[in-house]
Amino acid sequence: MLFRSGATGTGKTVTLQVLAEGFSRIGVPVFLADVKGDLAGLSQPIAPHPKIDERCVKIGIEDFKPGGWPVVFWDLFGNLGHPFRTTITELGPLLLATLLELNDTQTGILYSAFRIADDNEMLLLDLKDLRSMLTWMGDKAKDQKSEYGNLTGASIAAIQRRLQVVEEQKAEHFFGEPAASIEDLLKTDFSGNGVISIMDVTKL
């Protein structure tokens, strides 16, 4: 991991762009989080400028030809790029429990929800699916006790409240289909250049 800091105008963005271009050139896929919205230019060749010509002469570069790089844009909200999503099922109970900051008892209930979904060949795609599952578990708690343990109403209600918190933070945009995978971020183009994946996080 590289940490680049400095005052405004010291070249932080340019440093990041140069590194991304270098990695892409040698076939290494790159993932960038675009905080300010100024990295999209990697996809386009730079416009001619006297300062660029002056720099090329100074460092001995001949026949400089600017070019764009293979870029894929991602956006959690799907406005400025492909929507970046996953499903509740793919996230799994352990990571979801951590996200929701559940205690051990509540985490156990969440594991039971995933187990019930697996046993019944049900997919938990988004937060609505998980809410429906928890509601069903609360209604059928007595019938399921022998197989899945004590599904207490208080713990189920606590999980529902934690879901409300993450929904207020717009987390529902992150869950759903089509689900992105790590392979989507590890691609090269037909020329062997690493694809630069740029995630727009200006609204996060």
Residue ranges and their predicted role:
Residues 15, 19:
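Hydrophobic positions on the alpha1 helix immediately C-terminal to the Walker A/P-loop
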Residues 12:
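Conserved lysine of the Walker
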Residues 6:
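The Walker A (P-loop) glycine that initiates the GxxxxGKT/S ATP-binding motif of P-loop NTPases
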Residues 1-2:
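Short, small-residue-biased leader/transition segments that mark boundaries at the very start
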Residues 9:
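Walker A (P-loop) phosphate-binding loop of P-loop NTPases
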Residues 20-29, 37-204:
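P-loop NTPase motor domains
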